[in-house]
């Protein structure tokens, strides 16, 4: 699978729950730019090895390496977002009991949502 780094991202998260669907589509398509667009520029992403990456460059490098291995992600069971003001906690139970995700999203001035904190597997 080749990395798509030039696609346009007309599909945006109008609700915080949209982020999970957009992630799944973009990671399975190998769309690195699309994945980076799901995050604020100073977001923090936890990595499977217990580390973290920060900011657009770090998140881009992480996803470039991930999609290079051509993974296939299946949809999980998404829980309704918990919201307060312009923040939302999103979470998805991963298929097959493989854990769960936890993310914090922030509503942008244009009404769309982007993740600011992402822990892909909390269990």
Predicted regions and their residues:
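A beta-strand edge to alpha-helix "cap/lid" segment located at domain peripheries
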Residues: 2-34, 44-123
């Amino acid at each position: 699978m080749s990395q798509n780094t030039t696609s346009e991202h007309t599909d945006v998260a109008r609700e915080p729950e949209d982020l999970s669907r957009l992630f799944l589509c973009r990671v399975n398509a190998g769309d690195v730019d699309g994945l980076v667009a799901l995050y604020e520029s100073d977001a923090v992403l936890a990595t499977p090895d217990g580390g973290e990456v920060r900011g657009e460059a770090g998140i881009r490098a992480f996803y470039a390496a991930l999609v290079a291995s051509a993974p296939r992600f299946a949809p999980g069971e998404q829980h309704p977002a918990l919201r307060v003001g312009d923040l939302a906690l999103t979470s998805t139970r991963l298929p097959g009991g493989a854990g769960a995700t936890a993310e914090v999203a922030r509503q942008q001035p244009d009404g769309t949502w982007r993740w600011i904190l992402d822990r892909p597997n909390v269990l």
